[in-house]
Amino acid sequence: MRRWFSKLGSTSLASTSRVTAFSSSESAAVEQLADSSIPPPITPFIIAKPDIHWNVDFASDPCSWESCFDAHWEAAEKLLENEEEISYEKVITVFQHLNCTVQLLMMEANAQPESAIGSILDRHFTHQIMERVVDWAIAAPHFLTPTCQVNMIGLYEVIVGESHTQNHCLLVHKPMLLPLLKLLDWCRKSAEKRNFTPSNTDRHFVLLLNQICTKLAEDTTLLHFFFDFDDDCDEQFLVFSLLIPYLYDSGEVGQLARDALLLILSVSRRLKRVATFIAVKSNFCPVVATGLSGCFSQLSRSFGSMLYVSDSWHKINADDIDSYSSLLDFHSSLIFCNAVIQVAHGYVVSQVIRYVYHGFLLPVVLPSLLQGGQDELISSTAYYHLCLDSVTETVLVQTIVKLLLNESCESNKTVLDVIVERISAGNRLSQVSLSLVRTLIDLRCEDIMFDLVFKYLLPCTFLQPNQTLHLKNQMYVRTAAQTLLTFVPECTYKSSALCSQETLHIYLSECRNYVQETTDACCEKWVWSYDGRSPFFMPKINSDEESATNSNGAFVRHSSVRSSMASARNGLNRYFVSRNAHITADSLRQHTPPPELGEQESSSRSSFPYDIADSSLVLDDEGDELIIPALTPTSLMMMTSSSDYFQFAYGELSETDTEAINPSVVSMSGAPAQSISDKASLASTSANCDTDIEMARSFVLRGWGQIEDTDTFMALMDRVPASKIKHSLEENMALIDSRIQYLEELKAEAKLQDLESDGFKSDTNNDNDDEDPAPLGKPIECFGNQGVGPFLESIMRSLENMLDNSLYVTLQTTSVLAALASYPQPLIAHYLFDQRMLLQPNVKNLFKVMDSLKTQIDAYASSLDGFDVLLERGIKFLRSRAERYEKVVESSRRLRSSESFSRNGNMEGRSSSRGLFNRFRSSNNKRLYPSNDSSHPHEFRIYTHKAIESRDVTLDHARAKQFVFAAIILSQFCQELAATVLQHSTVVPRPKVSPAKDYLRREVNSAGKDANCCAD
């Protein structure tokens, strides 16, 4: 913690006593100062503290201002010109007079309606007051440096802070600006000499810089005076550079520095030159990442030893942050980093993201998540969870999540896989890991859900043969809801607090909102619908032997956090995937849009656009011909690595279209004839195709790269037959959107490349310049014969062990399952709820697990005397915990709302109101039980009048509590799942209207109005 003292600086006791003694002699008047001689050094003369006699007459008489100014400046000038040794008392006297002159100057400046040079300001310029004072202060003895700096800074604080005229800042004048820059440089050199150890000048210095930055944000024209647009200048932006060392200071100094830096960053968003300086020439970006690492290293490796955590603790909350200073500093640094991403220029953002990932997440956070004992892993997971909870900007969330998806440990598993493995432990580590996974699921990110769930469900190997036909409808909804309600334990029927129409209606309302949010997010941002047809599952072909022995190969897609979280102009267009995809007939023809994701491809809608034997494709002048060669093993590998695009290229190919395809390959003129081995390869490829459709899919249009002149290209395009297919307005609108998004991506990438090329030329010391801040993804292989994957298996296993797990692990497990149930994708929805689908014997069925739990709970309840009493006490206990949990959540909300940086509204899914204990809160938000009840509200005792008589029950009270809690949770969980599955059939996606569609609709409406006017 930096310390600062009074505005006059720290003084010794002796000097203070001298000031007191001299100040007591007030017989000398200001008028006598001109006639008085400079006292000898032994008995220095100190005048009384000068003051301005404020009254109505003085305030309304500018002439009196000038005379008062002249008197004070004359007194100060005599002391400045005195060649005697500068003492502390002399310094104080000089600055007392100067403070009066500055106040008079600001009175004059604020009294003028327009920017003009008044008489007092003219006197400042004529006498070069500020420059002379700065030079005099710099020449003072070293022990007086802090005092001189604090007082000089105080003068400029008045000049900058009390300037109330928006169009007239006195800093635009060189007699004011140049001494200020000299003062700032002097303060910086002093701080460097003491290695930036805390000093009493820090607060005043940073406050002045903050005031200057505020003026720069209000009037960007001032940048011409503080920012040197000459790239060869050493001190291009002194004010910004001076703030960086104070970025992570504790207390008010650090907060003032961070606020000032954010103001400059917001200005740089509109000025490319300033942004380039910040990103390349300054050390701001690495300092941001280094500060995060430093704050993280100060955190305790064992959170339990740092703070008391209860059994229900699973993540860091607002109370935890307020209770520990190092945790508060780390949280503040995360909030600042998020604010930087929010307000800064795109080039600065890319640099900050690069340094945060390579300078903080990789070297600091990643090892902590994978190494250490259980306490260390619990703390590291909670800290990582805090990072995810604290940030809201999409690109920063992507970067944090990327650590889980892209980085691997020694066993070649991703970090996310390692966290999933910890779920089934049933201890505090699994509780914290489950909480993190729940937050990840609430992000509604396609790449996260693909890694957790869908890459294991896509091959459909968890189903018995011929079961995928059930994925086409939602006929299971009503039956599933009714069945889920039958799993409510019968021992809870008598409790109106657990089972009633009112409770079910509350769940229906809450689940509708939650399912609607999930559906909208998936519809707006996700690429695939995961309905068994989109994306098209295709085996990975490496060789004939592998294809013969491994029927369920690897499904490979390009995974990218950007694909589901980063939004374009109106969110990611689901028709446009990547401009790096293979060139297809549709993409060249640009007439037929791709099929709607999840639609059944109609064979009558399209036809294969090219006939290889068509003579119209032969160029008459050179005899060259555009060929469609057979798919080679190399191109097969390319296809399997981008099978998403392969589906788009041939998804609409009908069986009748394949009859027109001639698989013969014609050699191009001037090229060697195709060898027999190539023909054999073609025959081998054809032999591996079971149907004509697969044979047609084994061709891809190539040859455009050999066309080098425009005339040949245009002649070839003229020979392309026009499409006879007509599309609806909605299809054309979607295609227009994809083209617009494509052009915008090209423009954005070109602009970013220009910025990077300009910046990196001058940044020769950066070793990571050739790396992207967040790579777009890596190939992810999806293998069959793995059931439903380790995540779903762990969750099902944890649910199955409900009667053995702790209360809070059970709450986390059911919370994660409820979040998964809100996803509308058919693969996950049918797996969880469709009883018609026959699963493989080794795959756990949700309904069977819940039926088994109900049976065990009812059997135990019927064998235990007084179970109804225990049930009521269990409800009371959970209600009290729910109220405490709501208070914690409300405290966290207040903390977020009190932050000085605005939150991103696109992350609504992360702040879901469906908390762990929300199932047990009262419907009218009041306690169901009076506070003066005989039992403590935070204890759950099973001793009743019957329990006292039965020693068997008292010896097994822990087991009884386990079953009581399980009965309560299962009753609520069944109703919640039933409400969720019912909403799957009623919720309709609400995608955003794209600007292109909105523009065309306005054009159509205006045309219709014009037609009506003409008709009238």
Swiss-Prot record:
Pfam families for this protein: DUF5917, KELAA, RAI16-like
Region of interest (Disordered), ranges: 586-608, 757-778
InterPro entries per the UniProt record, alphabetical: FHIP (IPR019384), FHIP_C (IPR045669), FHIP_KELAA_motif (IPR045668)
The organism's place on the tree of life at top rank: Eukaryota
Membership in a protein family: Belongs to the FHIP family.
PANTHER family attached to this UniProt entry: FHIP FAMILY PROTEIN CG3558, RAI16 PROTEIN-RELATED
Protein name per its UniProtKB record: FHIP family protein Bm1_18400
Organism classification: Eukaryota, Metazoa, Ecdysozoa, Nematoda, Chromadorea
